């Protein structure tokens, strides 16, 4: 299933990017990267990725997550991931990036932590 990327701004100043589908090599995954870069350019660097509807992630997707995290942190911001599914979490653990990324059980936990 192609990746769907939706963005919303909360009154608290947090930006939520909701993802649905597969985060894999291709234009769809680049849309996520572009969305994060656009937010950084707008100085909106408190970002939560709602991953609860992501069914699969490949190595390119992991790279985009890590790269996005690095860009946000370099810009002085915070990026958290909410509701990572067990299948995706397994990939993040295998690649050892689960220790780098800020992962929360659900969106409410990410919003409270950011």
Regions found by a protein language model. Give the residues of each.
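Amphipathic alpha-helical interaction surfaces in cytosolic regulatory modules
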Residues: 22-101
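Residues that form or immediately flank small-molecule/cofactor binding pockets and catalytic motifs
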Residues: 10-12, 86, 108
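General small-molecule cofactor/ligand-binding pocket signal
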Residues: 6-8, 82, 104
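Short beta-strand/loop segment at the start of cytosolic alpha/beta domains
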Residues: 1-18
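A charged, well-structured terminal subsegment
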Residues: 102-114
């Amino acid at each position: 299933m192609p990746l769907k990327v939706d963005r919303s701004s909360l009154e608290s100043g947090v930006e939520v990017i909701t993802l649905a589908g597969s985060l894999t090599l291709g234009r769809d995954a680049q849309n996520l990267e572009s969305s994060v870069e656009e937010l950084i350019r707008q100085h909106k660097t408190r970002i939560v990725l709602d991953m609860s509807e992501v069914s699969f992630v490949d190595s390119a997707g992991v790279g985009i997550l890590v790269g996005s995290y690095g860009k946000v942190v370099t810009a002085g911001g915070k990026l958290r991931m909410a509701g990572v599914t067990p299948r995706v979490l397994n990939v993040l653990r295998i690649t050892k990036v689960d220790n780098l990324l800020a992962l929360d059980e659900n969106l409410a936990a990410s919003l409270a932590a950011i």
